[in-house]
């Protein structure tokens, strides 16, 4: 005789379990905690203190996230068939390693891609952009450097000088570099801070406490409101528990034996593991028949922000382009394109191994042949590409982004180098514009900088040898849509076909933005969480002790920046 099913309430570890602690996960953690929910955040990476970051990226165990090689740093590198992806790892996600740049896209970005119909997304997100700016401490960069002056000259040559601007960034600036400033953002309720020293170390991990990483704002207050953060915890699967909740299976991410497997039970789940992490997890769960009702659009409409990364490297050591913040300025050569110069700090030369001599576009067959020809015709410069010494000081990196639509698909398949199991890879969908591995304006910018600095122009080696672009801003794969046929989630970030399952990270974005996407991810996360009801309507919001105000008020330097360089 079958025993009757128990009607007792199952024991839950939390109301909401959040997978990932980047921009989407951190916003979700704070706003759900404010609404009275018990929140648990699981993060595969480590928790970092300011003094723990590597002094240079030659300390690869602290810089790169390659657990198989016992490297547990903040920078992931993922090579797929169609793109090389740079992303972040650690409590705070991409904010630990990103270039601080927080920009609102051009209006046209909201009119392309697969944004859900029936909503004016520019208008809908406008108040959430303002909230995100306050929380992330967005201010204009107050100082330009030599690379920025060269970029301004390039903009002037194109007749686009009027579009050149210092970037809006999430950094604490002050009248004196390295000055202790208490908490200038949240009325003393936030962590103590130190002003920027312009060392250029934003993308290696800020060792001064000037960078407004998520552990200093959203996550800081989420934890003050009771949210729990468990670092070094990798989510391996999710499934319904049969009683209206969710089972989340995990293991320790930094162990190779005794992996500490554990299953958590939650009433709701927010997936915020970044585009690669979230899409891979959902594809794996569908493959294992744990989530069989997922949209067929899962894995599709993946975009790279149509990015190209190139630059120029001086032939002499008697220069220093590493001073400043990671990205200090940019301009629009046309309404669809944005160009920035990027820098690494002095001594952080390990990324030089991703560079080689610049060549123009072609196919996967012809472009390597062009590269070989360039190497033969410029043998000394070719040999210089193998010398990492003082690379960060000698190099000016160019980052170009476009909001023009192009996409590919993420899939799980057996790969030629490891046929024993399935892993994440990519393929192109018929009828979709391929992602660009070459943009003429990018090469034009690199050559201009090279001429002005006595340098040789350079490109990412994967772009010229494999015809595969590099992106630090992979988007989509679980993107918004009007129906399950054209999206994985609805306009409120709810996964089609499931209750209390959300996606809130870069994978939700349904189009190329053409600018650095962190501010948009934050604003869209604010929008998503604003739709979630209070846990107890009678209790109301658990407000922060003080409302976030305009970042750095009273200590921001004057805005008249352009006059310094014009």
Per-region residue spans from a language model:
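Extreme N-terminal leader/targeting segments of oxidoreductases
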Residues: 1-16, 34-35, 534-566
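Glycine-rich loop(s) and the adjacent beta-strand/alpha-helix scaffold that form part
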Residues: 34, 38, 45-56, 208, ...
């Amino acid at each position: 005789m079958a025993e009757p099913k128990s009607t007792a309430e199952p024991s839950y570890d939390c109301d909401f379990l959040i997978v990932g602690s980047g921009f989407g996960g951190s916003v979700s953690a704070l706003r759900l905690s404010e609404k009275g929910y018990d929140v648990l955040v699981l993060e595969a990476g480590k928790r970092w203190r300011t003094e723990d970051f590597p002094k240079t990226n030659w300390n690869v165990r602290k810089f790169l996230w390659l657990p198989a090689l016992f490297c547990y740093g903040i920078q992931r590198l993922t090579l797929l068939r169609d793109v090389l992806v740079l992303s972040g790892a650690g409590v705070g996600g991409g904010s630990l390693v990103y270039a601080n740049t927080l920009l609102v896209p051009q209006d046209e970005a909201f009119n392309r891609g697969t944004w859900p119909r029936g909503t004016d997304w520019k208008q809908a997100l406008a108040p959430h952009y303002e909230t995100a700016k306050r929380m992330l401490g967005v201010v204009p960069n107050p100082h330009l450097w030599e690379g920025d002056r060269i970029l301004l000259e390039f903009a002037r040559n194109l007749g686009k000088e009027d579009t050149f601007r210092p970037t809006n960034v999430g950094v604490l600036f002050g009248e004196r570099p390295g000055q202790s400033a208490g908490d200038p953002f949240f009325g003393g309720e936030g962590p103590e801070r130190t002003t920027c020293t312009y060392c250029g170390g934003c993308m290696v991990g800020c060792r001064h406490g000037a960078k407004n990483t998520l552990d200093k704002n959203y996550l800081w207050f989420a934890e003050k409101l009771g949210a729990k953060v468990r670092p070094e915890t990798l989510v391996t699967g999710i499934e319904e528990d049969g009683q209206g909740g969710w089972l989340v299976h995990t293991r320790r991410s930094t162990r190779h034996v005794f992996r500490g497997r554990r299953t958590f039970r939650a009433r709701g789940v927010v997936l915020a593991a970044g585009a690669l992490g979230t899409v891979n997890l959902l594809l794996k769960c569908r493959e294992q028949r744990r989530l069989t009702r997922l949209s067929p659009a899962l894995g599709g409409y993946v975009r790279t922000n149509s990015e190209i990364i190139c630059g120029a490297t001086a032939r002499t050591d008697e220069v220093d382009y590493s001073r400043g913040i990671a990205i200090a300025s940019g301009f629009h050569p046309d309404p669809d394109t944005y160009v920035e110069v990027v820098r690494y700090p002095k001594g952080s030369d390990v990324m030089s191994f991703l560079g080689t001599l610049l060549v123009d576009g072609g196919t996967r067959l012809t472009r390597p042949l062009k590269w070989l020809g360039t190497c033969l015709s410029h043998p000394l410069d070719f040999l210089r590409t193998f010398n990492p010494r003082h690379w960060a000081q000698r190099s000016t990196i160019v980052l170009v982004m476009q909001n023009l639509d192009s996409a590919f698909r993420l899939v799980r398949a057996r790969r030629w180098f490891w046929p024993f199991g399935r892993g994440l890879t990519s393929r192109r969908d018929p009828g979709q514009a391929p992602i660009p591995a070459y943009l003429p304006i990018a090469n034009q910018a690199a050559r201009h900088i090279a001429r002005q600095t006595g340098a040789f122009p350079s490109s990412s080696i994967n772009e010229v040898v494999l015809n595969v672009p590099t992106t630090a801003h992979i988007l989509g794969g679980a993107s918004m849509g009007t129906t399950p046929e054209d999206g994985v989630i609805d306009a409120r970030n709810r996964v089609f076909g499931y209750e209390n399952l959300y996606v809130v990270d870069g994978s939700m974005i349904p189009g190329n933005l053409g600018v650095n996407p962190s501010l948009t991810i934050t604003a869209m996360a604010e929008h998503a969480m604003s739709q979630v009801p209070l846990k107890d309507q009678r209790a109301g919001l658990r407000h922060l002790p003080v409302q976030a105000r305009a970042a750095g008020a009273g200590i921001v330097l004057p805005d008249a920046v352009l006059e310094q360089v014009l």
